[in-house]
C-alpha cells in the first residue's frame, strides 16, 4: 500500500498540470496530495517522511506554492493552509470535498501513537498567515502596533513581511488628529483595495504571492471615529478594530472567513494590555517605547483623543517594571514612557499613604477630579530610575498641569532621567487658551517655565502649537509668536488647526480662520521658532555631552557615528578607538571602537543650529559620566 501511495504521489508531483482528480490546474492547490500523503506517512518508512509532514489529526497539513503551468509546482514547507482555505478556492473536477475529508478523517483515526508523537510542525508552517503593517501618527500608535503583533503571534500569525502583496493580513494603524493624516490613510486603503482585486487576477495565472486575498484591517483612532464610513467604502476594508479591542482581532479575522465584516470599536475603562509583552518592530534597536497609561480626561476643545482613546487608566507599576526589565535584558539602553497624558499616571491598584493629595502645577487646573489616588508618575519614575540605573528614561506626551514640584526635583536628582521636558503650550494668548479649555493662562505657563529652569538649570524644553484656532485674531497670533521667543524652545511641533468632529470646538465654535491665513500664521510661527532654537544648540558648544550611539551617520556612514544627548540633541562624531572607562576600572586599558548602544562622552565643537558635531573622548556609562572625577586620573595615566 505504501509503494502504491508513493507512486501515485510521485505521479502527481511530476505532472505540470497538477492532479486530474482535484482542482483546476494552475489556479489551485491539490487536495489529493494531502490525502495521499497521510496514507504514505502511515505506511512508509522514514524515507518518505523526509518529503512530507506527518498527519497529526483530521486537519492534515501540506504546503506548496501556487501551481504554474510552465514550471509545475513544488512543495514549500514554510507556509501552510487548512482544508477550509483550499475548499473555498475552486471547483472540483472529480470526487467531492466531503469524500476526501471523510476518507482522510477515517484514516487519521488509525494513526499510530508513534506518528502522533512526531515533532511538531515548524513554527512557520503552523502560521495562519503573513502580516504586513503600516503605522501613522504618534508613538502610542507604534507601541500599539507592537501589542497587536504580540496578540497575533500568540494566535498563530507568526510571520511579518515587508511586501503587502505577500501578506494574508494587512494592518493599517491610523491617526485621526488632523485631516491630512486621514487623507494619507484613505490613499493607502485605495491601494490595498487594488491589491485585493489584483490578487484574483494573479491567482488565476499562478502568480499570486499570498495564499489568499489579503484581509485589510483598520486599527487606531480612525477606526473608532469613521467606522461606518470605512466599512461602507466599496469593500475596501474587512475589519475595523479600535484601540481598546485589539485582543478581539483573531476572532474578527475569523468572521471574515465566513463572509462577515469584523468590527469592534468599543472603548474600555480598564484595558491597558498590561499582561502583553509587545513584539518589537525594530528587534535590534537600543531604544524602545513602553506604554504606561492610556486615554485622556482633559477634554481640550480641539482634541479628538478622548473620543477615540477613551478615559484615562494606568498600568500597574509592577507590569511596567517587568516589561522594562525584559527590554534591559534584550540590550535596550533607552526607554520612552508613553501615554496620551503620561504624567497624569495614577496606579490606583497600589497602596498610597493616607493624606496624600493630588497636586497640579501652580496656577493650573483640571476639569476632571481624581477619585482614587494611587502611585503617581513621580513614584513610577522613582522606581524605574533606581532599579535600572544604566538605562536612560524619557517620557511623552504630558500636560503642563501635571508637573508638581516632586516630579521636577526627581528629574534634577536622577542622572538617568533625561533633562528634557515637553511642555505643550498650544497658544500664547490667554483667551484662546480658555477657548481651548487648557486650564491655564499665558502667565501661569511662563511662571511654570521659570520654575522648571530654576530647579533644572540645563533643561531642554519642547512644545506643541496650533495656529488659526477658532476665532483667533492677528493680535492673539502675535502673542503666540512672542511666547515662542520668550521661552526659547529646543524643538516644537507646529500645525495649522484642523477641525475634528465630536470635539467641543466642533459642537460649539466656528472654524472661521481661512486656510490661507492658517498657513501664513504657521509659516510665521516656524520662522519665530527657528530664530530661538539656534541659541539652544549654540550654547552646547564647548560642553561635554553623554551621547547614546544609535548608528552610523548617514552623511558619512564609513567614518562617523550619530546619537542623542539626554536633551534630545543629535550629535555626530568621527569614530576612532577609545578607552572604555568601565574597563579601565577593571584594569583593562585596551582601546576599542564605539558601537551602537554605547554611551560615548563627546566634547561639542560645532553647532549647525539643528544638530551638533564633536570629538569623542571615551566610552562611558551614565553612572561614571555623572561622577567623572573618580576615573579621570585613571584615564590620564593610561593615555600617558
Swiss-Prot record:
Q: What Pfam families does the record point to?
A: Radical_SAM (PF04055), TRAM (PF01938), UPF0004 (PF00919)
List ligand-binding residues for [4Fe-4S] cluster 2.
Answer: 296, 300, 303
Quick one: signal sequence residues? none
Which molecular-function annotations from GO does this UniProt entry contain?
4 iron, 4 sulfur cluster binding; metal ion binding; methylthiotransferase activity
Its required cofactor(s), as named, are: [4Fe-4S] cluster
Q: Name one GO biological process term.
A: tRNA modification
- Where does the Radical SAM core domain start and stop, copy by copy? 282-535
Domain TRAM per the UniProt entry, residue ranges: 538-618
Query: What's the domain of life for this entry?
Result: Eukaryota
| Residues annotated as domain MTTase N-terminal | 129-258
Q: Looking at the keywords, is Iron-sulfur present? A: yes
| Cofactor, how bound (note) | Binds 2 [4Fe-4S] clusters. One cluster is coordinated with 3 cysteines and an exchangeable S-adenosyl-L-methionine.
Binding site residues for [4Fe-4S] cluster 1: 138, 175, 221
| Keywords (A to Z) from UniProt | 4Fe-4S, Iron, Iron-sulfur, Metal-binding, S-adenosyl-L-methionine
Entry's family note: Belongs to the methylthiotransferase family. MiaB subfamily.
Function of the molecule = Potential regulator of CDK5 activity.
Q: What is this protein called?
A: CDK5RAP1-like protein
